[in-house]
């Protein structure tokens, strides 16, 4: 079912766009942007106070995975990131063991394959 988000702030730096408008979503993708779009057969969401923007990138994330997963792990960290609009993140190497070898990096990236955000690593 299509979804119409009315009166959300739409930000798209690539288009120089920053204004309140309606978004029509079809199959999970933006099909149309505009003002006063018709709601025909669409679920209506009132977007006042909401922001629609490209996914954000967090360049400094402590996933603590491996070794300190009682604080955070790939899945909880990515879930929290996605809830805040972050679609990509850079994981710091402060883990136990330290993420300082190809093996530990590969292991983290393998676990991240099914996470809610794209994970990259730093050293």
Specify the residue positions occupied by each region the protein language model found.
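A glycine-rich helix N-cap at a beta->alpha junction
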Residues: 110-123
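N-terminal metal-binding scaffold of metallo-dependent hydrolase/deaminase domains
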Residues: 1-39
């Amino acid at each position: 079912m299509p979804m119409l988000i009315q009166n959300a702030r739409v930000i798209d730096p690539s288009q120089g766009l920053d204004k309140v408008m309606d978004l029509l979503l079809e199959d999970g993708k933006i099909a149309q942007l505009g003002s006063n779009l018709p709601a025909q057969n669409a679920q209506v969401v009132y977007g006042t106070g909401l922001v629609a923007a490209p996914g954000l990138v967090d360049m400094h994330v402590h996933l603590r995975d491996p070794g300190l997963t009682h604080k955070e792990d790939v899945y909880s960290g990515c879930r929290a990131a996605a809830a805040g609009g972050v679609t990509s993140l850079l994981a710091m190497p402060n883990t136990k063991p330290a993420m300082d070898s190809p093996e530990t990096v590969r292991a983290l990236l393998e676990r991240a394959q099914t996470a809610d955000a794209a994970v990259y690593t730093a050293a």
